[in-house]
């Protein structure tokens, strides 16, 4: 077990979430080259902080501090929304473990999943949060996963079975929905 020995309080006085989520120089050569030569186009778009904030501002203020509320990002990319959601939950008094346990997401590209996990760890470190890194990784591996969201059962948090996918396809053909 790896225990992070930072203080228990988030020092948001010196932490700037807008700077942390800045993607103005995001299309680095490394990132662009990871997508070159791939067999499929991902049509990735990484949401700038201003849009992330504007969308998250639409969430009821009381939801951020409610430990029973869950947040789901069906295509989390590099984690812009996920990181902001976790940060905002922490700012509203939710502990790190609950913030992670109530945040779910699906992403098609495995490298983006790894990047998101790493960004969350960096967020915790930057905020000086005392957390268990192994436990945090276990939660992220369960809740922030790599899969095609079209074949993911969000209600039961698992992939659809082949039979379920056939039933869904059949229903779409007969009802158009």
Sequence positions of predicted segments:
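SAM-dependent methyltransferase catalytic region
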Residues: 2-177
